[in-house]
């Protein structure tokens, strides 16, 4: 909403990176004159810049302000809370441990609010880090999670840390909406012969939804738009389920739903209610 309002205002502004991981949304904003730059130094001096939902490091914020750039901060509040947690941890002499994908923009931004963070992708990665040096199990560690990670990954790390570490504290910072969406997708996939996951292929939440659905459903399709859906190639199924990544706008979900509803398929009725809620 912030990006669209800014685009309509007509005032010069750029986005630092894609506002969300959805190419269709980014393209739509570009059509309205709001473009993305990839590096902070590409933001014109004295202009306005939108910080994306994944957040940016403290160094980026400081650099932009020093150049007189007006920051419109669209960082997810849940992500901002993690920035505060890791900062506070280091102020108390603790080492932040970030559970997430090391190259994900959100994780990079969180790490950028620390001086000496540790990033682990999962339980095995944590185990390897802990036992590289025996003294690490006695360090004061503060665990946080990438907001779009899964409960399975987080709980695996918590279990390992509680077993091996003598001074660890845990902040479950997985987004509640993300966790709920993942669990609903898992349950829905178990009842369907085919699951359609709608979202950008580069979105971590969308890819994780597809992986979760594949655990209980043998046929999973990942599509970005309705035109990606080749109905002639869809295997027969008594029931078809639809779910979507958090960054997928309601109008794209509706396009897919309408296209599939035009065919002779029974689509899980609860999805219609979910769609109505997402449009409100």
Regions found by a protein language model. Name each.
Residues 1-280:
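The feature marks the mature, well-folded catalytic cores of soluble enzymes
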